[in-house]
Amino acid sequence: MATRRIISQEKTLLEKDDRIGSSPAASEKSNITPAVPASVIIKLLAFTFAMIVIPISSYFLTVDRLFKGNSTYAGATAAIMANVVLIGYIIVAMAEDQSDQENEKKGGGGKGEGKKDL
């Protein structure tokens, strides 16, 4: 069954609140800080670059100089180097996560909790 709208109780478009959903009002400043810290993005880009460059360069450096044309051993070396880079990334990520947890335990409150929105 349909209900009737009472037009006298409805607000016009100009009378409605400036807030639409979760967006801030026009008079408030929005928080534009990135969700991920810049140091995390830099580490990710560095390890991405290393994941591309190190295995390929290790293959081409070892195929002729170390293994004398045997591409199987050179490919295995490249795979091992890719795993070394991956393990290095995991170790760095775990160390960063542990340092964040220690900061929270000490009462630091994390990296971004000390800041207040203006």
Curated annotation (Swiss-Prot):
Residue numbers spanned by region Disordered: 98-118
Membrane topology reported for the UniProt record: Multi-pass membrane protein
Keyword RNA-binding part of the UniProt annotation: no
Record flagged with keyword Transmembrane helix: yes
Residue interval(s) of motif Prevents secretion from ER: 115-118
Lumenal topological domain: 57-73
Pfam family, one: VMA21
Listed GO biological process terms: vacuolar proton-transporting V-type ATPase complex assembly
Regions that span the bilayer: 36-56, 74-94
This protein's UniProt keywords: Cytoplasmic vesicle, Endoplasmic reticulum, Membrane, Transmembrane, Transmembrane helix
Recorded superkingdom: Eukaryota
InterPro entries: Vma21
A Gene Ontology cellular-component term: endoplasmic reticulum membrane
Localization terms from the record: Endoplasmic reticulum membrane; Endoplasmic reticulum-Golgi intermediate compartment membrane; Cytoplasmic vesicle, COPII-coated vesicle membrane
Parts of the chain on the Cytoplasmic side: 1-35, 95-118
Biased composition range(s): Basic and acidic residues: 102-118
Family named by the database record: Belongs to the VMA21 family.
Task of the protein: Required for the assembly of the V0 complex of the vacuolar ATPase (V-ATPase) in the endoplasmic reticulum.
Name of the protein: Vacuolar ATPase assembly integral membrane protein vma-21
Species this protein is from: Neurospora crassa (strain ATCC 24698 / 74-OR23-1A / CBS 708.71 / DSM 1257 / FGSC 987)
